[in-house]
From Swiss-Prot:
A family per Pfam: tRNA_anti-codon
Record EC number: 6.1.1.6
Organism: Prochlorococcus marinus (strain MIT 9211)
Any GO BP annotation: lysyl-tRNA aminoacylation
Protein name: Lysine--tRNA ligase
Length: 503
């Protein structure tokens, strides 16, 4: 045990004997720090206002000068200075210096990091700092761990993620990020609800992990002796709801994929999936740019923002261009000219310095590889990349006029995929054929290939109206709107590799 922790434990025992904590039950709060700062800006230097307030929070800093002390108290809204005077405390409490709540207890037993509640009136110091002139105080929680140095904060980035509770105390930007995230989620739900979309929850535990090309987490139900999977998408169940007659439906929730971890990927993440009957992928483009621009204006106050030193303009309309056009523009390769000649397409890619992966077994997959290598990272302004190869889009409807292509788009902002959408495939025969092809890939070793969900195919056989479907990555959108470089900055408790020596 560290000397500092031992000292704080001793102080906690003293407080307990004196009857002042160290762990309070409740405290009646009348005002928040930030509200006081705003509502009493007119209070002149050196003046007091006879408004009695009760404020609670964490002591962030303390300065003791004989019979006078200045503490900074922080609550969820902000911070305010405490003006603590020995004579004032004694005058209002009639306590001797050994009694609970005395000035000596305050200066001797209260440390930075402790939670206290105070009662007093407002006073602006001669230097212009709005303060609470404290009449009485109560210990609410004794902190046994010292806070990081206020000048250097929590400088170890990984420690910020492992001890988010400390990060939130010492880093105002982290608090702002998670507040913005909560407001963003609320704004998305409000926007959808106002347009008659209904949020319905679908299963997290599933007998088949479908709806995306991803490896699932596997668990086991003991009573049923049944292997189950954490969902990798909400798509197939939401489509079942459209079959059942819900014409506008969505779900905002957690997704789980047993994949790598990076600044863009966390195995547990959040999406919103939206389905609209009688719509196609062009309608979903309209919906996407309208909703995201609305959310951006709500959170950032404008549709023009800064991300990592560059300006991003989210004002609609956004650029719409096909994958084929982008690859041709960037590499000079016209993949439509290759037909089904994989060898010719591979040679052409190598001639312009692109890698040809072993798993690319079709021209469509090679075009997608060329896009990912040569184009994707440069799409900084919002861009709808349209018309994807059918081989990589088994749940999307065939394009109405382009063979080998489906009506699908992905939205790219700041070089990252942010949304994915289709004109949904509603032909049950076509759907089953494509899932059988996916099954063949799976049997050949592709563990991310789709599985066949027979009940989903059965639902399509019951009949699903023409539908547009959309999925948006909430975490990546929060990254964009809060200017955060890593997905770990916007997930309160991201998954991390265990520290060395821990179990």
């Amino acid at each position: 045990m560290s000397d500092l922790k031992e000292t704080r434990l001793e102080k906690a025992q003293v407080l307990k004997k004196l009857g002042n904590g160290p762990y309070g039950i409740r405290f009646e709060v009348t005002h928040k720090a930030a509200v006081l700062q705003v509502e009493h800006q007119d209070l002149a230097n050196g003046q007091e206002r006879q408004l009695e307030v009760c404020v609670a929070g964490r002591v962030i800093s303390r300065r003791v000068m004989g019979k006078l002390a200045f503490f900074t108290l922080s609550d969820e809204s902000g911070s305010i200075q405490l003006f603590l005077e020995k004579a004032t405390l004694e005058e209002h409490s009639d306590l001797d210096q050994e009694s609970p709540g005395s000035f000596s207890q305050l200066t001797d037993l209260v440390d930075s990091g402790d939670w206290i509640g105070v009662n007093g009136i407002l006073r602006r110091t001669d230097r212009g700092e709005l303060s609470i002139k404290v009449f009485s105080w109560t210990m609410l929680c004794k902190s046994l761990q010292p806070l990081p140095d206020k000048w250097h904060g929590l400088s170890d980035v990984e420690k910020r993620y492992r001890q988010r509770y400390v990060d939130l105390i010492v880093n105002p930007q982290s608090r702002k990020t998670f507040r913005s995230r909560a407001l963003m989620v609320s704004a998305i739900r409000r926007w959808l609800d106002e347009r008659d979309f209904l949020e319905i929850e679908t299963p997290v535990l599933q007998s088949e992990a479908g709806g995306a090309e991803a490896r699932p987490f596997i668990t086991h139900h003991n009573t049923l002796d049944l292997s189950l999977y954490l969902r990798i998408a909400t798509e197939l169940h939401l489509k079942r709801l459209v079959v059942g007659g819900f014409e506008r439906v969505y779900e905002l929730g957690r997704i789980f994929r047993n994949e790598g971890i990076s600044t863009r990927h966390n195995p547990e993440f959040t999406t919103v999936e939206i389905y609209q009957a009688f719509a196609d992928y062009t309608d979903m483009m309209d919906l996407t740019e309208e909703m995201i621009s609305f959310v951006c204006s709500q959170i950032c106050g404008s549709t023009t923002i800064q991300y990592q030193g560059k300006e991003v303009d989210l004002t609609p309309p956004w650029r719409r261009i096909t994958m084929h056009e982008l690859v041709l523009e960037s590499t000079g390769l016209d993949f439509y000219e290759f037909g089904q000649d994989i060898s010719k397409a591979s040679t052409a890619m190598q001639s312009v310095g692109l890698n040809v992966p072993d798993h690319a077994d079709s021209v469509g997959r090679l075009m997608n590889e060329a896009f990912e290598q040569a184009v994707e990272g440069d799409l900084f302004q919002p861009t709808f990349v349209m018309d994807y190869p059918i081989e990589i889009s088994p749940l999307a409807r065939k394009h109405r006029s382009k063979p080998g292509i489906v009506e699908r788009f992905e939205l790219f902002i700041a070089g990252r995929e942010t949304a994915n959408a289709f004109s949904e495939l509603i032909d049950p025969v076509d759907q089953k054929e494509r899932l059988l092809l996916q099954q063949s890939r799976r049997q050949a070793g592709d563990l991310e290939a789709h599985v066949i969900d027979e009940d989903f195919v059965n639902a399509l056989e019951v009949g699903m109206p023409p539908t547009g479907g959309l999925g948006i990555g909430i975490d990546r959108l929060v990254m964009l709107l809060t200017d955060s470089p890593s997905i770990r900055d916007v997930i309160a408790f991201p998954l991390l590799k265990p520290e060395s020596g821990s179990q």
